[in-house]
């Protein structure tokens, strides 16, 4: 038996939200891309965008027939993490639960390693 470890978890809640957001679009190839950039109050920040391109080296994870795409540079900071979608009193948003982050800012959108 070959057990392949998926380096990032793409939750059902996140996949369901991505699916609902792209249903009205005219592009069946859209995927949610998560990436890391420098910035924010803690040094790095998460970014989310819809993308219909998968580049060489990108990791694609499928859930509920929708895809999550991560570039190789961002992947090294996200291994073991979870991409989720939450709704609450403070609003609704995609979130990354990242075990590699040693600290995060109050809003949770930036982190340090």
From Swiss-Prot:
Name of the gene encoding the protein in the UniProt record: erpA
Protein name per its UniProtKB record: Iron-sulfur cluster insertion protein ErpA
Keywords attached to this entry: Iron, Iron-sulfur, Metal-binding
Similarity annotation: Belongs to the HesB/IscA family.
Function (record text): Required for insertion of 4Fe-4S clusters for at least IspG.
InterPro entries: FeS_biogenesis (IPR000361), FeS_cluster_insertion (IPR016092), FeS_cluster_insertion_CS (IPR017870), FeS_cluster_insertion_RrpA (IPR023063), HesB-like_dom_sf (IPR035903)
Residues where iron-sulfur cluster binds: 41, 105, 107
One Gene Ontology term of the molecular function aspect: 4 iron, 4 sulfur cluster binding
GO biological process, one term: iron-sulfur cluster assembly
Any Pfam family hit: Fe-S_biosyn
GO annotations of cellular component type: cytosol
UniProt subunit comment: Homodimer.
Cofactor: iron-sulfur cluster
Note on cofactor: Binds 1 iron-sulfur cluster per subunit.
Species, as recorded: Actinobacillus pleuropneumoniae serotype 3 (strain JL03)
Domain of life: Bacteria
